Amino acid sequence: MALEGLFDIAGAATDAVDHLASSAISQVKIAAIDPEVFFDFTQQRPIVSLDDTGARILRWPENDAYELALDGDVPSLVTISGIEPHLRWRTFAQAVGEIAQKSGARLVVTLGAMAGQAPHTRALGVVGSASDPVLAERLGLGRPTYQGPTGLVGALHVHLHELGLAVISLRVSVPHYVTQAPNPEATRSLLARLELVTGIETGHASFTADAAAWRSKVDAAVASDDEMRSYVERLETLIDNSQDLLPSGDELAAQLQAWLRDNTDEG
């Protein structure tokens, strides 16, 4: 799940979910959250367009859920890619929780992108956390530690946890000096980590060429500014001396499957 808004810098998270949908064997809409009570339409205006016959089409902000059929023996995947609502976050979280329960989900993964001190010359780091302590330990993820004012995603995570659903949050750090959309490297990094943690093939390699082109474009811009080039070099040193934000290894997907089996047996 990913929503356009404060925690989707450069559209990296929603691009990742949209890529999963477009890569599926098939997709079926299973739910649509009515935008009427959740949006201030003076801030998020509907879009009018013309079809092939010249008839006007009005498109309202959408938060739709799709069930995707994937390759192999992977169970179906339900995705929500939409827009962060302005109003009634608690009611919106309840709507998402209802979709998750009706679809039989036991795990919800939210994707996000935030501006950070990340050099564009390095693989972009992904921060991961899990609401379930056993799952967090098995996957080498942290537990949520933030305290203070929160947004829709924070309210959503709490509600899903109260429903008994495990929640994993994956957030990629986007270079704060280049936040324009699209950012194929950020999208690739999110998809790669999602695949690593869940074992679901995400096709992240398809972003490799676009990510390289994006990096070359930023390289050229940075090279023309001595101060910026020096700043990026300092960021590189900082990142090179830090540890990876998520563990690597094929055993992570196996650990997730073991957790799902254990929780099924307990239920």
Task: Give the ranges of each region predicted by the language model.
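Flexible, glycine/proline-enriched loop segments at strand-loop-helix junctions
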Residues: 3-7, 80-89, 139-147, 177-181
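Internal, conserved structured core segments that host functional sites
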Residues: 75, 83-134, 156
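N-terminal short beta-loop-beta anion/metal-coordinating cradle
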Residues: 1-84
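Catalytic cores of processing enzymes, dominated by hydrolases/peptidases
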Residues: 117-201
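Structural motif
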Residues: 27-28, 76-79, 106-108, 166-169
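Short beta-strand segments
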Residues: 1-2, 81-82, 110-112, 171-173
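A conserved C-terminal secondary-structure "cap"
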Residues: 178-267
